Amino acid sequence: MGGQLKVFAGQSNPDLALSICNSIGIDPGLIEYVCFSNENIKVKICENVRGCDVFFIQTSCPSVSDNLMELLIALDALKYASAGRITAVLPYYPYALADSKDEPRISVASRLMADLIAEAGADRILTMTLHSPQIMGFSRIPVDQLSGVPTICAHYAELGVDNAVVAAP
């Protein structure tokens, strides 16, 4: 897509979105959220996105379900506002650990998330290193995963730490 670049943010982490926008030298997109008394939400895109290359940033921090619904409704609003291409930027992929059926009668929620995000209007998903590479195969749209390892290694090398050990679950 050759459309103008626009970045919008969900309410889960506005500071992250502002930092990203500042680093690439653009203003965040204008978006309005209304929460009704019954806890339903409305998302309004407050500028023209027709034909634009849109990135929507939303983290899956608590409240995961609320942030997920906000993401889906925002993607749908962008789709119906005729955005040229929509990339869902998800620093932490929702339900990433639910990537297999390890007991009977349970959902593979990670696959469901891929379906919902694509159906809502995303053309691509951009996320950080996934728990399991099979998650990329769940999606019918492209999934790009970025790694933080080079940045972390460079940071500790700059500090002069020679034999650091990193442990993670």
Residue spans for each PLM region:
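PRPP-associated nucleotide enzymes
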Residues: 1-169
